[in-house]
Amino acid sequence: MSTTRSKGLHALQRWRSFGEDRAALARQLALRAVAEATAAVAVVQDRAQAAREQRLGLLQSPLLDLTRLTASAGMEEAAWRDVQVCQQRLQHAEDDALVAREQHETAHRMARAVAHRATRVVAIERDAAEKHVFDSLVELRGRPRGGPHD
């Protein structure tokens, strides 16, 4: 085995490690986006629930003001549309997080495969070098002493 092969594998190993680090960062960012989207859904749902309670309060009041009731119903409807939008964003963020997780796992497997291969190649090269040294010593000891040397 040549050291060129192990150097190439080490370069590939560094590249795959870099890819794994990038995939891990993308996964962390995707998880952060999911957490932020979840928090946004909770906030918007609280607002929509407050708008619903306000509208119900207006309906239960002894004096019914249609203008305020219509405005309150419009605000509640807009709030529930915002909830739907935030839930869609959350779903997209969860889908992106799933894709990021799969990409990170793939990058991790690829990096490990190259690392194992590089370890095997280095061991093979080390064994070949030891065998070469041993063969050289055997050859040197096998030459007759005092005779002509090449």
Each model region followed by its residue ranges:
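Charge-rich amphipathic alpha-helical interaction elements
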Residues: 1-150
